[in-house]
């Protein structure tokens, strides 16, 4: 059994390290990995970041499951791509990843489903944002 962990941070290192304890595991690939994962005997760094190339790699290596750590590949739709190719992958779809990747989407989702959240407003033009600040004053948080 082979697994692929996508990411280069400490979270992915910890995840891959723990997954390496799985009985019957042949190999864990980490793409692209980091200096820490490079030192782990059970892990193999793979210098690939392109989603299509990662899917190709998963197919060629017959990876049983891919786990995605970072937000960016999720927001870019890597789960959708892998699933469209019949590959097993753990993580939210591009659409669901917006809860993490888009503050506006998350706030609107919470409002729509009556989930408590701070008041918010979203602007696409600077003048509208300034007018809102002038009307409501401080304290205010801008993101």
Please report, for each region that a protein language model flagged, where it lies by residue.
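ATP-binding N-terminal substructure of ATP-dependent carboxylate-amine bond-forming enzymes
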Residues: 1-95, 127
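Active-site nucleotide/adenylate-binding loops and adjacent lid/helix of ATP-dependent enzymes
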Residues: 4-5, 99-142
